[in-house]
Every structure is written in C-alpha cells, then in structure tokens.
Amino acid sequence: MWINKYACEFSIDENLVAATIMTESGGDVKAVSTKGARGVMQITPATAKRLCKKLQRPFSVAMLLQPQHNIFLGCYYLHNLLNTFDGCAVLALAAYNCGPNRVQSWLEKTPHLTTWEILETHASLETKHFVWSVLYRYGNRTR
C-alpha cells in the first residue's frame, strides 16, 4: 500500500522501491542495522533528520520504525538520488547505500569510466553487493 502510494508520488518504479526494501530489510518493519539504520528502507537517523528538515516535517527516531514514514522518506530520498544522478539507478542505489557525496567523488575522479566501471573501481564490496542485489530483485519482479 505505502510502496505504491509513495512510489507514485515521487515518480519511482514501485518495483525498484520493493526491491530496495527486500534488499535492505527483507520487509522487517523493526529492522535496525549495526550502523543504526532503521525500518524497511533502512534509513539512518541522520539522513532522516536531514530529509525531514528539507521537507519541513517533524522528525523522531521512532518514526523510522513506522512503515508509512519510513517508506515516504525512503522514496523521497531515492527520488532525489535518481534526480542527482540523471536517472541512473546504479549510481542512485550506490548513493543510497554509501552516500551521495562519495558517489559524486567517484564521478569526479574518473569521469571517463562507464557507470559499471565506476562501481567496480570505487565501490566497497558491501555497496557492490547492495546494488547487484536490488537490481537482481528488481529484474525478478519485472519479468
């Protein structure tokens, strides 16, 4: 329900959102990572606080465990990342995992490389695995 609603609101493929959720948390609304990311879309409190400030919405760490709020923020964040990286899902997903500033620095260091070469050259094993896992699940959902 929330996936469809917010994917539509932010013009994102709902299958990409669902694949991100399954990769991040397996759909566990109470998931908390070792790095403190929370909820189905595994958003860190720092990222959520920044997004809420930008949206002029109230913020609390507890709201990250509420699917409606978590999916709203996750879709908003993914939408912004897709816009930042010109609709490139690979770079947007990498940024979702390791941060947009890091991905931007990869692009600045090696502008001559393809998207896949940039990912292979610069991304950590965790980020590579995340991107591949989301894309694999996305592919399975869209067949």
Q: What residues fall within each predicted segment?
A:
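Catalytic glycan-binding domains that act on GlcNAc-containing polysaccharides
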Residues: 1-143
